[in-house]
């Protein structure tokens, strides 16, 4: 792994004002304030806080098992990444210091690391970050860190680009997570966000979400996965026999077919990806569906220089926001 310079790292227990220093042993860092030492193993620097809320721990465990059971890279994942980050493209990462907040198994880390970044911090609280470290061990600019996104162990104004895809809505306090992302972003930097939308997901909020909260999220992921196989296979058949042909694999809008924009989009995916999508929607204890007015209110508090919303597949929000440059007041 690429060990980051200690002046960019902060103690997750003491907060942003507590910069770490190089530890006495190799590949370790220490907090001069509390005396805690942090080490690396398996290519991952461990900067997890001493205490994490139990609901967060359970969500992390469920997701970690989900990602670890779907350990693979595929070419279509890069297209999906670029769709989620549009209009920000590959060149926006070149020569920049980047934070990937919530990297999971590293399916996006692998691509960002190949875009010529100056440095990439890929953070995740789950054990899946160990897989991300293996995927990116050939990239000297990538640092994989096990950390809590509600206490990002980076200094203020330390990254040029922050990317958080499909993760903010799984935090116990999504607004606090957004503030943390904004804190570490440099003035003039860019935040790219993708979250579940409340708009367009009424049937999920009304029918699927209660099932997740009351039942499926309480079943360990390793047991839940085989139980969901009939549902996953039924969805896969519907995608291949109906949604794919009718929508031309997501290229043609169809108003009469329910949830057509999203299901047409994922109709091109293989079964293992569809099965993973089903599992990801039903395994986590924490999941929020965020409305545009809610997100606009949160961003208004941050006073960005610019921010742009895009309704992706009519069921999720992509947000690109620029932090005001130093001395600039909107």
Task: Annotate each language-model stretch with its function.
Residues 190-233:
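Conserved class I S-adenosyl-L-methionine
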Residues 175-187:
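A short glycine-rich, Lys/Arg-flanked "PGG" loop and its adjoining helix->strand segment in the class I
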Residues 219-292, 296-302:
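Substrate-binding/catalytic lobe of Class I Rossmann-like enzymes that use SAM or dcSAM, i.e.
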Residues 2-150, 288, 294, 309-330:
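Conserved N-terminal segment of class I S-adenosyl-L-methionine
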Residues 137, 172, 186:
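Short conserved AdoMet
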Residues 160-172:
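A short SAM/SAH-binding and catalytic strip from SAM-dependent methyltransferases
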Residues 150-161:
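A short acidic, Gly/Pro-enriched loop at the edge of an enzyme's catalytic core
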Residues 92-93, 156, 178:
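A short, aliphatic-rich alpha-helical micro-motif
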């Amino acid at each position: 792994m690429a060990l980051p310079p200690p002046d960019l790292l902060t103690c997750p227990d003491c907060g942003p004002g507590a910069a770490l220093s190089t530890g006495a042993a190799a590949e370790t860092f220490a907090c001069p304030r509390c005396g805690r030492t942090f080490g690396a193993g398996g290519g991952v620097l461990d900067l997890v806080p001493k205490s994490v809320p139990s609901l967060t721990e359970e969500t992390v465990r469920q997701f970690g098992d989900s990602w670890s059971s779907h350990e693979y890279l595929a070419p279509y994942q890069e297209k999906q990444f670029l769709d989620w980050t549009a209009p920000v493209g590959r060149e926006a990462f070149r020569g920049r210091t980047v934070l990937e907040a919530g990297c999971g198994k590293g399916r996006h880390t692998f691509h960002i690391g190949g875009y010529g970044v100056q440095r990439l911090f890929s953070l995740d609280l789950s054990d899946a970050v160990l897989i991300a470290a293996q995927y990116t061990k050939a990239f000297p600019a990538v640092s994989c860190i096990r950390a809590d996104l509600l206490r990002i162990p980076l200094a203020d104004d330390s990254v040029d680009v922050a990317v958080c895809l499909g993760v903010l809505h799984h935090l116990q306090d999504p607004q606090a997570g957004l503030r943390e992302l904004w804190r570490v972003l440099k003035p003039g930097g860019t935040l790219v966000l993708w979250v579940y939308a409340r708009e367009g997901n009424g049937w999920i909020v009304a029918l699927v979400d209660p099932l997740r909260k009351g039942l499926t999220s309480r079943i360990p992921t390793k047991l839940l996965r085989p139980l969901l196989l009939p549902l996953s296979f039924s969805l896969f058949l519907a995608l291949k026999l109906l949604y794919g042909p009718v929508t031309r694999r997501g290229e043609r809008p169809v108003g009469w077919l329910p949830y057509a924009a999203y299901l047409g989009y994922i109709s091109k995916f293989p079964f293992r990806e569809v099965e993973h999508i089903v599992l990801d929607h039903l395994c986590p204890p924490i999941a929020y569906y965020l409305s545009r007015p809610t997100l606009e209110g949160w961003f208004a508090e941050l006073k960005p220089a610019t921010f742009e919303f895009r309704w992706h597949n009519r069921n999720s929000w992509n947000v690109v926001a620029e932090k005001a440059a130093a001395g600039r007041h909107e």
